[in-house]
């Protein structure tokens, strides 16, 4: 009986050690033409350059779940959405991500300049909804979240890059 209990817990114990799955949340996050449901239209401002790709992710707006492992969130039935698109060579930089319902969500955009699918603070840019001031640690979810309405909600996220000893927008001195 004890071994059965151990086997039942195995998926929960291993979920925290499984590396991020790059395709999790993509199907749920992809916007479709003329779709009326709730979504964020994210304008990305302050790019260092037009290389690499954007990775836009949506998390529950709770301290415990914000920036948590995507496998753990999905296994627990919590909101996780992801959109990955190449950075356009020119023109506006807008991304669309669907959310399950109107409400508050943590939103983050990674400018993955070398396309390695992970955040390298020395190379890549990062931005959050609400555009909180960043140091070298993640912001509080209350400062890095936005409210999605019942339709498409527009937000602007300013990218931050390593400048001196902290992450900050390029336009700020």
What residue spans do the PLM features occupy?
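Bacterial N-terminal signal peptides
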Residues: 6-15
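Extracellular beta-sheet/turn segments enriched in Thr/Pro/Gly and aliphatic residues
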Residues: 21-32, 139-165
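Acidic, glycine-anchored loop motifs typical of Ca2+
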Residues: 112-121
């Amino acid at each position: 009986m004890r071994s059965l209990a151990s086997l039942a817990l195995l998926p929960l114990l291993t979920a925290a050690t499984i590396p991020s799955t790059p395709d999790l949340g993509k199907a749920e996050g992809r916007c479709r033409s003329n779709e009326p449901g709730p979504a964020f239209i994210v304008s990305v401002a302050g790019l260092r350059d037009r290389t690499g790709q954007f990775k836009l992710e949506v998390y529950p707006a709770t301290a415990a779940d914000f920036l948590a492992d995507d496998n753990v969130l999905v296994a627990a039935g919590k909101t996780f959405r992801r959109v990955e698109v190449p950075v356009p060579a020119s023109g506006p930089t807008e991304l669309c991500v669907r959310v399950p319902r109107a409400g508050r969500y943590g939103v983050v955009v990674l400018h993955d300049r070398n396309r390695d699918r992970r955040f390298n603070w020395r190379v890549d840019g990062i931005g959050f909804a609400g555009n909180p001031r960043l140091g070298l640690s993640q912001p509080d979810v209350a400062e890095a979240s936005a409210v999605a309405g019942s339709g498409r909600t527009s937000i602007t996220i300013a990218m931050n890059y390593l400048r001196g000893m902290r992450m900050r927008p390029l336009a700020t001195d």
